C-alpha cells in the first residue's frame, strides 16, 4: 500500500509492504523511515490523523477499518516541542547520504510552523521545467540503453531548476541547529557514549573533508575505522593521495577536561612527530543532549573546522610533502578537497566533466559522490527515497537522458510575423523574421540595439512610421541645398508652410511696425 504522509505542509510517499497493514505497522514505518529522514529522533511523539483534528487510536486496528486505501493522505501532528527541520517540498529531492549513499536526513533550526487545514492535493505531480543542462551527450561517456522507469515512479518525480539543498555540505558551512548529513551518519554509526567520543567522530570527519583516506581496505567512507577506540585512547590512521609513500596517525588522549591530539608522520618506517593540538570538548559538544538529535549535540562547527584545519591538518600536509622532497604545487589541483567541492558545485555539469578530463586528481575529486548528490538535487527534483548504495553520477546521467528525450523539452518553431496593419508601411515583412537575440526588442543587448530602427523624415507620409532604415520613396530626402552648416537659402518646395526671414520670399512689409515675435507660435 502506497500512502502520502503530510507534515508541516509538505508531503512524502510512504510504502507499507504488509498485506493488511494495521495502524501499528504504519506508526512503525513512520518512525523507522520518515522521521529519521526529516531530521527527527525516532523517539519523537506524533499523532496520526486524517484531517488534523481527529486522532487515530488503536494500533491493532487495520487501516481498512478507518477507510484508508492506497493513495490516501495521512497527516501527522508532532507532540514534542522541538525545533522543526527545514524540510523541502514534496517535489523536492529526498536527501540521502553524502558519501556512502545512506538514507536521507535533514536537521535545521527552523521553528515548527502552525498546521492549517488544507484540501489535499496531489503532491506527486508537478510541472516540469523545460531547462536543459547541456546539448552534447558525448561528454557523459558511452551511451547505454536504460530501461524506462515505471509509470508509478515517474508519477512521483517533477523536474525543475533553481533548487538547492538547504542542509550544509561541510562542517565549515554549519550553523546553529544544522549539521552535515555525513556527520549525522558518522555519529549514528559510532555509538558514542560521551562527549569525547562525539568529538573524535567530528575530528575524523574533518580529516575526510581535507582529503585524507582512512587506512585499511575495510574502512568505509561514512563509518568509523575499526579499533578507533581502545582503552580510552583514540587512534586514527590515514593516507593522502598527494603524499604517496607516507601515512599519518592521529593519537587523541583525554587529559582532564581536554583532549590532546598528536599528529605523527611515518615515512620509510621512520616516525616523526609533527603537530599537537589541545581541544576542549565542552566548547563543541553539548553533554546534556547526547543521544538526541545530532543537530543539537554539536555547536560552533565553523570555529572547530577552521581551528583544526589551520593548526593541524594543512601544516601536516605541507610537512609531509616537504619530507618526501616533493615540489611545491599550487593551483586548483592542490586545493583541499573541501575547497574543490565548493568550487565544483558552483559549476554546471558540463564544466565538471571537462575538469575531470584534465588530470587524475581532478578526476578523483569530480567523481566524489557528495558532489554528484548535490548536483542531482540541484538540477532535478525527485522525492523518491534512495537506497544506500545509490550511484548519483549514473542516476544523474539517466535522468538527463530521460529529460532530453522528453517531448516537453523540444523548442517551439517561431513563424514570421504577419503583414503590418498600418497602411503604407515601408517594409511589411521584416528582413530577419528570426531575431538572433532571445531578448525582446528594446532591451539592452537585444535586436533593437544591434539594428535600431529610426524614423525617416524624408517622406511626409511615412516620416512618423518607424522602419528598418532608409527606404526608397517618391519624394527626395530632406537635405541642405547649399551650405550644410548655415541656414537654408530658400523655402523647401516639398514641406508646406511659410519661409523664414532669409528665404527668397521675405515677409510682407510691416509699414513701420516691429515684427511680432509671437507669429512663429501662431
UniProtKB/Swiss-Prot annotation:
Keywords attached to this entry: Cytoplasm, Disease variant, Methylation, Mitochondrion, Neurodegeneration, Nucleus, Parkinson disease, Parkinsonism, Ubl conjugation pathway
Gene3D superfamilies in the cross-refs: 1.20.1280.50, 3.40.1000.30
Region (Important for interaction with CDK6): 129-169, 381-522
Matches recorded under InterPro entries: F-box-like_dom_sf, F-box_dom, Fbxo7, PI31_Prot_N, Ubiquitin-like_domsf
Disease involvement: Parkinson disease 15: A neurodegenerative disorder characterized by parkinsonian and pyramidal signs. Clinical manifestations include tremor, bradykinesia, rigidity, postural instability, spasticity, mainly in the lower limbs, and hyperreflexia.
Known partners and oligomeric status: Part of the SCF (SKP1-CUL1-F-box) E3 ubiquitin-protein ligase complex SCF(FBXO7) formed of CUL1, SKP1, RBX1 and FBXO7. Interacts via its C-terminal proline-rich region with DLGAP5. Interacts with BIRC2. Interacts with CDK6 and promotes its interaction with D-type cyclin. Interacts with PSMF1.
Name of the protein described by the UniProt record: F-box only protein 7
Organism of derivation: Homo sapiens
Recorded name of the encoding gene: FBXO7
